[in-house]
Amino acid sequence: MYNMYPLMLNLNKKVVVIVGGGKIAYRKASGLKDTGAFVTIISPEICEEMKELPYITWKQKTFSNDDIKDAHLIYAATNQHAVNMMVKQAAHDFQWVNVVSDGTKSSFHTPGVIRHDEYIVTISTSGKNPSYTKRLKQALTSIFPKLIKKLSRTHK
């Protein structure tokens, strides 16, 4: 298997489709805030938090292949592995797909992100251990602003 290559993407005016409406789909959608992406959620139902996101379009339906035909980035984020695999199989080779139920089937992974002013740090286990990534992000979040402040004083 090849190693993952880290990137920062400009998603302004890009189409992002999230298939699923639960907590994981919500986390993916909330991470897209302020990106300028056109975010569409495909799911018969969505969690209450998702309903509060003003930048999403919700299509209240089950997944069909046509739902992702124009997508640049796709999250298969349902609680049903078979549906997630249907999404993966329906995608074209040029589309980037994240299968939340099986990282080995994903063409990209969303890292943990820490933002402070104009600085961004991402943390990843290349999809192998998302819960560890989350714990590491939580630990580093409190340290990061102090570190930036300290380094900026010594590198002026």
What is each PLM-predicted segment?
Residues 61-67:
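A structured beta-alpha segment of the ubiquitous adenosine-cofactor-binding alpha/beta core
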Residues 11, 67-69:
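A short, aliphatic-rich alpha-helical micro-motif
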Residues 10, 114-156:
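Adenosine-phosphate binding glycine-rich loop
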Residues 1-53, 58-61:
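Hydrophobic, well-ordered beta-alpha structural blocks that scaffold small-molecule cofactor pockets
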Residues 66, 82-84:
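Short glycine-rich, flexible loops that bind phosphorylated cofactors or substrates
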Residues 40, 71-80, 119-128:
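Short beta-strand and adjoining strand-loop segment in the mid-core
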Residues 73-77, 84-109:
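ADP-ribose/adenylate-binding Rossmann-like module
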